[in-house]
Amino acid sequence: MARARRTKRASVTDIYRGCKQAGTCPPDVINKVEQTTIADKILKYGGAGVFFGGLGISTGRGTGGATGYVPLGEGPGVRVGGAPTIVRPGVIPELIGPADVIPIDTVTPIDPAAPSIVTITDSSAVDLLPNEIETIAEVHPVPTDNLDIDTPVVTGGRDSSAVLEVADPSPPVRTRVSRTQYHNPSFQIITESTPLAGESALADHVIVFEGTGGQNIGGSRNATIETAQESFEMQSWPSRYSFEIEEGTPPRSSTPVQRAVQSLSSLRRALYNRRLTEQVAVTDPLFLSRPSQLVQFQFDNPAFEEEVTQIFERDLEAVEEPPDRQFLDVIRLGRPTVAETPQAYLRVSRLGRRATIRTRSGAQVGAQVHFYRDLSTIDSDALEMQLLGEHSGDTTIVQGPVESSFVDINIDEPGPLNIGQQESTMADDTDFNSADLLLEDAVEDFSGSQLVFGTSRRSTNSITIPRFETPRDTGFYIQDIQGYNVAYPESRDTTQVILPQPETPTVVIRFGEAGTDYYLHPSLKKKKRKRKYL
């Protein structure tokens, strides 16, 4: 008889998963899985008020935890199997030896013939500290020549109280004058062509400090000028850098770096993963304001804000072409996110999804697309830069060939009318021509000149040409390719001359390059016959 095979019973977890939804689980299965038995409740509520951690229970060591086993009614606990603790001092102890003994020299016996009175100079005292160094202080006398000694002055009479004037014993402050010059490449001195008399701002400023000494010119040093002097408290000039405030580098964003890195780490993986996300750069400006108009044709609703995720629904059978080819088959377009590129540009991004393949069950399969647009930089206004500096005179530039001369002549006066007249003995024989007034006696030489066509409205291009020492006359020609070239149409009426020619022969002979070949006219060729000889 074959033994029946024992079927394995399902575990408590498997039974709980199958019967929980139907509501047919036994109470013991629910209490086992959800930990609601009596023992579990005792551990939950009892563990909230009693802490047995650190006692080493069920560890097998038997050490009694951190404090050890404490017998009832005794002192602190002792660890089982622990080594005694040796108390060591914090300072290294020193050995105590005998006291230092100072050697005393042997007393020399006194000679009987020596005098009983010992002078101080002949003292033979024992030097107990032979290592002392003799110190000699040299005091130099203060020179008394030309010293102004301030002595107290007592003024007053018998009936008045004495007033004691004490001078300030503090010595004069020593000062030093120094001059520092900094080179600033952005500063240029403007020189004037018409200098005027007076103070110029281009000269260096000289600052005289008190306390540097000096000599009095004229008069005696002890004159009454000293009594008329009035002393002011001098203050030092501040440095040029004392008013500058050191400012650190301002932050580029208001969000802390730690929070920004944590929040943008997942977003960067979703946007810039080239294996899973397609990168598409959008150039249409509608991507910033109305991105839905790039996906499908629709009416513009000004009350709708396109700052949220947009979902586009399309018919499965309809084939629609989007306004922009880059947004083909896009069914979802996320909300805009603003980030900074490594080139310090501001980038607006949207994460979209395409529905390229659709199955019969309605499932849509497509790739994720990262649409982004980098905002261009804002160029600063082109302002005309001016030189840093000041000048007291007027800057005058005179260009003789450019300026025009105006002649104001009164034709009623007889003086100017004599220009260009021949000398006449009669005053009434005044005969002149108005063209004589325009004549000029100066003779101009235009040899070696060049004629330049241009207009004064356009700016003149200045080109610096070096000049070398050479005995020959060197001429330079600068071609102006920035002007306007005016091309006028030219028409030439030439009379065609027809020469009379005789009648041309019927035979045309064409000579080749060698002149040995010719071609006969077809009319001169013989006709072919069937019979050559008749």
Curated annotation (Swiss-Prot):
Sequence motif: Nuclear localization signal, positions: 1-10, 526-533
Flavoprotein is among the record's keywords: no
Keywords, sorted A to Z: Capsid protein, Cytoplasmic inwards viral transport, Disulfide bond, DNA-binding, Host endosome, Host Golgi apparatus, Host nucleus, Host-virus interaction, Late protein, Microtubular inwards viral transport, Phosphoprotein, Viral penetration into host nucleus, Virion, Virus entry into host cell
DNA-binding in keyword set: yes
Chief location of this protein within or outside the cell: virion
Domain of life: Viruses
Modification note: Highly phosphorylated.
Entry's Gene Ontology BP terms: microtubule-dependent intracellular transport of viral material towards nucleus; symbiont entry into host cell; viral penetration into host nucleus
InterPro entries: Late_L2 (IPR000784)
GO cellular component: host cell; host cell endosome; host cell Golgi apparatus; host cell nucleus; viral capsid
Disulfide feature: C19-C25
Gene Ontology MF, one: DNA binding
Intracellular or extracellular location(s): Virion; Host nucleus; Host early endosome; Host Golgi apparatus
Family: Belongs to the papillomaviridae L2 protein family.
Function in brief: Minor protein of the capsid that localizes along the inner surface of the virion, within the central cavities beneath the L1 pentamers. Plays a role in capsid stabilization through interaction with the major capsid protein L1. Once the virion enters the host cell, L2 escorts the genomic DNA into the nucleus by promoting escape from the endosomal compartments and traffic through the host Golgi network.
Assembly, per entry: Interacts with major capsid protein L1. Interacts with E2; this interaction inhibits E2 transcriptional activity but not the DNA replication function E2. Interacts with host GADD45GIP1. Interacts with host HSPA8; this interaction is required for L2 nuclear translocation. Interacts with host importins KPNB2 and KPNB3. Forms a complex with importin alpha2-beta1 heterodimers via interaction with the importin alpha2 adapter. Interacts with host DYNLT1; this interaction is essential for virus intracellular transport during entry.
UniProt protein name: Minor capsid protein L2
Record lineage: Viruses, Monodnaviria, Shotokuvirae, Cossaviricota, Papovaviricetes
Gene designation: L2
